[in-house]
A protein has these predicted regions:
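Post-transcriptional modification and biogenesis factors for structured RNAs
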Residues: 1-223
Length: 223
């Protein structure tokens, strides 16, 4: 079990995360966790009680990084704090390379220039990180027209009540899934799967002829 989790960490986690509000012991939470495993979410956050309906997860939670939070406000604060810490650490690496080059009285080497380019991309990604709420609300952006940032935290509500006002207050953007039939909504679990796959469709580079290998599809993130 630990080996499988480590392998997923090494080769197929993506930098987006998801959070689910657990106020109604909703069976869709397990479905969302299962989809997070399938679509390579780096972390799953459960907001509310630690006890949640695991039936739909089919034990995939054992291979995910699952964190628990007492409130959506605490989750948002800790996520933004972590992003700020990564920005500071990356900027420190950039500055250190420049200082080393100046101390040698020579320009950056080709390898250092490449590292600076990679750092610039990481910093740009971090500066554009967002918390995104998935809900059908006035002013929300249709998912089909929305460009997900590479680093993001996707917020999903419980079946029925949807996201709490506290969650919506923490969101940078609100996105909804366009629907065209007589039904006015889809399940929270289905919505989570659609949103995660939309992120993958925008950011993942699927290697090979388009078929999954025996151990799953091989993919990387656009750089």
């Amino acid at each position: 079990m630990a080996a499988i989790k480590a392998d997923l960490d090494a080769r197929s986690r993506y930098p987006y995360e998801i959070a689910v509000e657990n106020w109604t012991h909703d069976f869709n939470i397990g479905s969302a966790v299962r989809s997070a495993n399938a679509f390579g979410a780096s972390r799953v956050h459960i907001v509310g009680p630690h006890k949640w309906n695991r039936k739909g997860a089919l034990m995939t939670e054992l291979y995910q990084h699952v964190d628990y939070h007492p409130s959506i406000r605490e989750l948002a604060a800790s996520w933004r704090y972590r992003i700020a810490g990564e920005i500071a650490a990356e900027q420190a690496r950039v500055n250190a390379r420049i200082i080393r080059a100046q101390s040698r009285h020579r320009p950056l080497s080709a390898d250092e220039q490449h590292q600076q380019t990679q750092s610039a991309h990481r910093l740009d990604t971090l500066h554009h990180a967002k918390i995104i709420a998935l809900d059908i609300l006035p002013g929300a952006v249709p998912m089909e027209r929305y460009r997900f940032p590479e680093r993001c935290l996707l917020l999903f509500g419980a079946e029925g009540p949807g996201l709490s006002q506290a969650a919506l207050d923490q969101a940078d953007d609100v996105v909804y899934i366009s629907q065209f039939g007589s039904v006015r909504s889809i399940t929270a679990g289905a919505a989570a799967a659609v949103a995660m796959h939309s992120w993958v469709a925008q950011h993942a580079v699927i290697e090979g002829p388009g078929a999954a290998s025996e151990s799953g599809s091989s993919a990387t993130v656009h750089r």
